[in-house]
Amino acid sequence: MDDQRDLISNHEQLPILGQRARAPESNCNRGVLYTSVSVLVALLLAGQATTAYFLYQQQGRLDKLTVTSQNLQLENLRMKLPKSAKPVSPMRMATPLLMRPLSMDNMLQAPVKNVTKYGNMTQDHVMHLLTKSGPVNYPQLKGSFPENLKHLKNSMNGLDWKVFESWMKQWLLFEMSKNSLEEKQPTQTPPKVLTKCQEEVSHIPDVHPGAFRPKCDENGNYMPLQCHGSTGYCWCVFPNGTEVPHTKSRGRHNCSEPLDMEDPSSGLGVTKQDMGQMFL
C-alpha cells in the first residue's frame, strides 16, 4: 500500500515539475523581443534625428544663398541707378587769378557737356527713392510702348495691374474730354513772302505794251535769260536780276554756261575776273 501511494504521489508531481521547467523559456523569449523592439525604436529615433540635423544644415545654407542673392540683386540695381550729384566744394583762388582773363581757346576746342543731364533730374531722384523700398517693382523698360505695356502686365500681379489699368482709363477719358472742349480754330495760312522778281511781276499786268515784265522760275528767282518783247532785245542776268554786261543783243544767247565773272552788287561773292579786264 505504501508503495502504491509513493507511485501515485510521484506520478502526480511529474506534470507540475514539467510546467515549472517551461516558465524560464517563455521569459527569455519575451526579453529578446523587448530588446529587439527597443533597438529598432532607437535606430528609428537616431535616423530621424540625423535627418533633422541634415535638413537644418541645408536650410541654413539655403537661407545664406537667398540672402547672398538678394544682396547681389540690390548691388546690381544700385550700380545701375544714376549717381547723385556730388556737392561742389567752394573754389579757393587767389585774387590775382580771379583778375586774370580766362583763355577762350581751350573752351572753344573742348565740346560743351551738360553735366546735369544725367543723374540730377527729378525722375532720377524719385526713381532712386522708390527703388530702395522695392527694386523689383520698377523693371527696366527699353522696348517700344506696346512691348513695355506687355512686359508690365506680365511682371505685375493682378491687383496692381487692375489699378494701373483703371488709372489709364481715367487718363484716357480726361484726354478725350479735354480734346472735345477745345475749339478748332481755322488755320490761317501765313502770307507768302514775295521775292524781288515776283514783286516786280506783280506790279506789271500780263499785257502791257512797251513795259518790261521779267520772267521768274518756280522758286521766284530771275530766269538766266530775260527778253524785252517790245524791242526784241535779250540779255543774261545774275540771280538777283542784274544785267550781265555786254550780253544784250537781238541774237541768240546761251546763259546756261557758268559766267566768268559776277556782279559785285549781286551779293554772290567776289568777281572771278577783274572788271577792267572785261572792258578791254
From Swiss-Prot:
Q: Is the Transmembrane helix keyword given for this protein?
A: yes
Write out the annotated subcellular location.
Cell membrane; Endoplasmic reticulum membrane; Golgi apparatus, trans-Golgi network; Endosome
Query: Which residues of this chain are annotated as glycosylation sites?
Result: 114, 120, 266
Residue numbers on the Extracellular membrane side: 57-280
- Recorded topology in the membrane: Single-pass type II membrane protein
- Kindly report every residue range on the membrane side named Cytoplasmic: 1-30
Q: Which UniProt keywords apply?
A: Adaptive immunity, Cell membrane, Chaperone, Disulfide bond, Endoplasmic reticulum, Endosome, Glycoprotein, Golgi apparatus, Immunity, Lysosome, Membrane, Phosphoprotein, Proteoglycan, Secreted, Signal-anchor, Transmembrane, Transmembrane helix
Chain spans, region Disordered: 246-268
> What SUPFAM superfamilies does this protein map onto?
Class II MHC-associated invariant chain ectoplasmic trimerization domain, Thyroglobulin type-1 domain
| GO CC field | cell surface; cytoplasm; endoplasmic reticulum; endoplasmic reticulum membrane; external side of plasma membrane; extracellular region; Golgi apparatus; late endosome
Single biological process term from Gene Ontology = positive regulation of neutrophil chemotaxis
Question: Thyroglobulin type-1 domain: from which residue to which, for each copy?
Answer: 194-255
| Superkingdom assignment | Eukaryota
The transmembrane residues are 31-56
Q: Which cysteines are joined by disulfide bonds?
A: 197-216, 227-234, 236-255
Q: Mark the residues carrying the PTM Phosphoserine.
A: 9
InterPro entries linked to this entry: CD74_antigen, MHC-II_Gamma/Thyroglobulin, MHC_II-assoc_invar/CLIP_MHC-bd, MHC_II-assoc_invar_chain, MHC_II-assoc_invariant_trimer, MHCII_invariant_trimer_sf, Thyroglobulin_1, Thyroglobulin_1_sf
A GO MF term: MHC class II protein binding
> In its keyword annotation, does this UniProt entry include Transmembrane helix?
yes
Subunit structure, as described in the record: Nonamer composed of three alpha/beta/gamma heterotrimers. Interacts with CD44; this complex is essential for the MIF-induced signaling cascade that results in B cell survival.
Q: Which PANTHER family match?
A: HLA CLASS II GAMMA CHAIN, HLA CLASS II HISTOCOMPATIBILITY ANTIGEN GAMMA CHAIN
Q: What does this protein do?
A: Plays a critical role in MHC class II antigen processing by stabilizing peptide-free class II alpha/beta heterodimers in a complex soon after their synthesis and directing transport of the complex from the endoplasmic reticulum to compartments where peptide loading of class II takes place. Enhance also the stimulation of T-cell responses through interaction with CD44.
What protein name is recorded for this chain?
H-2 class II histocompatibility antigen gamma chain
Its encoding gene is what?
Cd74
